[in-house]
From Swiss-Prot:
It is found in: Nucleus; Cytoplasm. One of its GO terms (biological process) is protein ubiquitination. The keyword Cytoplasm applies. It comes from Mus musculus. The gene is Asb10. This is Ankyrin repeat and SOCS box protein 10. The keyword ATP-binding does not apply.
Amino acid sequence: MLMSWSPEECRDQGEPQGDRYSLCAKLVEKPDRGSEEHLEPGLGPIIIRSASGPTLAFWQAVLVGDVGSVSRILSDSSTGLAPDSIFDTSDPERWRDYRFNIRALRLWSLTYEEELTTPLHVAASRGHTEVLELLLRRRAKPDSAPGGRTALHEACSAGHAACVRVLLVAGADPNTLDQDGKRPLHLCRGPGILECVELLLKFGAQVDGRTEDEEETPLHIAARLGHVELADLLLRWGACPDVRNSEGWTPLLAACDIRCQSPKDAEATTNRCFQLCRLLLSVGADADAANQDKQRPLHLACRHGHSAVVQLLLSCGVNANAMDYGGHTPLHCALLGPTTAVAHSPEHTVRDLLNHGAVRVWPGALPKVLDRWCMSPRTIEVLMNTYRVVQLPEEAKGLVPPEILQKYHGFYSSLFALVRQPRSLQHLCRCALRSHLEGCLPHALPRLPLPPRMLRFLQLDFEDLLY
């Protein structure tokens, strides 16, 4: 049973027996706070919400980067302010509202969460280089982390390369972990990201340093961001292209998992993914590496509609029929991906897989494929051209919305006219030859002494109708 006593109610209970008393004692006990080791004896953090006078003026000067005012106030010993003064930017009133809300749910929170920072952190996060230099000259500790992050973490996450340089020269540790187990190298973002990363590496940051929980390296993060230049920089500094995180993901897997945010970004997203994958493969990344769920780069590239990446991976000889932990092949992933992937031309992905020996879709699933991908008639075309007959029920026409039927009238008229009807002799010859070459299709077809047009026909070239 969940106890919901407040500290006052606990004190009123007297001395209950057993576990209840122990729990009550723990509730009223002052909790340990990791930040207290950073505070001077007898002093607590300065609450910004209640600050006034020189303290408030000092805080505002740091925020705007007014180095003159910061210097003047620090020079006045009567203010009691120091370069390492700790400020609490949290809102106690907001906590009180939250506390009363959770009490209504029969829960109890003993203390509110402090949000601690120092002038050094604020200056670093806002790019105030002169204020930063002043504070460091006045003996501010570069690795102070009352809130769980150092000033170097803040400067890197904001992409302020000049501040990163100042802190590193002052002796900041480039490999220290923040409260989330991340190093400065993992947090680099913003316009100065490349310069920040290079500075960290020059000052001894571990190029393959891992995060504490996920065990991700900076190269994993560069791949997830789709940042080709950052990945290239890390690889030139010796980053391992096949390093795995705690779930078995390699940077190549992370790159193939890049998702398109909107149809307008489809081309740019696929291009970034392609450039990243080509870069990683060029330095020896395993094109067929699988994570803990047995997902391979080809599964992910197919699921997200990265057709150029699919071609690249297939050219490396990856298995077009490998199954993930759920029993899905790359072709399944391509057809199970979001229908918004139509902007990525899924028909090219499906055709490339089939031309590299992918096992065809079970005929009984074709109505579901038609229902899902009817807005991409070329995807339907390339699938249907791998069967000797159109294996659809007569009522399948009802699966296609009228507006799609009207838009692609020529193709869908030819499709439904062939339901339970014989296909052309030309098509049957294609099926027979492809079946005969099964297992060596991608290597054998290009070697056949055939005219280019006939070769394209055998490789399921798009014609926008069926016969």
